[in-house]
C-alpha cells in the first residue's frame, strides 16, 4: 500500500477539497485516465485499480501512477465516547480535483488501454474519462 515514509505532522485537519488540479496533461505515456469529478482516493483504491489494469494488459506496456496518498485520515474506535483527543490514523488518501490525470499507460494498443482503464475506473469512487496524448 502507498503511504509516505515520514511526515512532518502525524495528523492533519480535515480541510476542504477545492480548486483546480495540477497535472492535467498526459505527460509520460500515450493514454491516460482523467478525473472528471472531485473526491478522495484511498491507498487501497489506487492499488486495486493498478492491479485491475496490470492483469488486463498482461504485464505488457508500462503504467504510471500519477497520484500519491499523502493525507492521513483518522478514526476513533467503535463504541468509544466522544472527546479524549483525535483518533488514530487509519488510512491514507489522495485528494483529487477535476482534470487530474491519475494513471498513464503506453506500449499497448488503444483498444486494450481503453478496456484496462474502464476496468480500473470501476474500482474508483470518482467519475473518470479516457484521454490520449495531444501531439502538437
Swiss-Prot record:
GO terms for cellular component: cytosolic large ribosomal subunit. Pfam families: Ribosomal_L16. One of its GO terms (biological process) is translation. GO terms for molecular function: rRNA binding; structural constituent of ribosome; tRNA binding. InterPro entries: Ribosomal_uL16, Ribosomal_uL16_bact-type, Ribosomal_uL16_CS, Ribosomal_uL16_dom, Ribosomal_uL16_sf. Part of the 50S ribosomal subunit. This is Large ribosomal subunit protein uL16. The gene is rplP.
Amino acid at each position: 500500500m502507498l503511504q509516505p515514509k515520514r511526515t512532518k505532522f502525524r495528523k492533519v485537519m480535515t480541510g476542504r477539497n477545492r480548486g483546480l488540479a495540477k497535472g492535467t496533461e498526459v505527460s509520460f505515456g500515450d493514454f491516460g485516465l482523467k478525473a472528471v469529478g472531485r473526491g478522495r482516493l484511498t491507498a487501497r483504491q489506487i492499488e486495486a485499480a493498478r492491479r485491475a489494469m496490470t492483469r488486463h494488459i498482461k504485464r505488457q506496456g508500462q503504467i504510471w501512477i500519477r497520484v500519491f496518498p499523502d493525507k492521513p485520515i483518522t478514526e476513533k474506535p467503535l463504541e468509544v465516547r466522544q472527546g479524549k483527543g483525535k483518533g488514530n490514523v487509519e488510512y491514507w488518501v489522495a485528494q483529487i480535483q477535476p482534470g487530474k490525470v491519475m494513471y498513464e499507460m503506453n506500449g499497448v494498443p488503444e483498444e486494450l488501454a481503453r478496456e484496462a482503464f474502464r476496468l480500473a475506473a470501476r474500482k474508483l469512487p470518482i467519475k473518470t474519462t479516457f484521454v490520449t496524448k495531444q501531439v502538437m
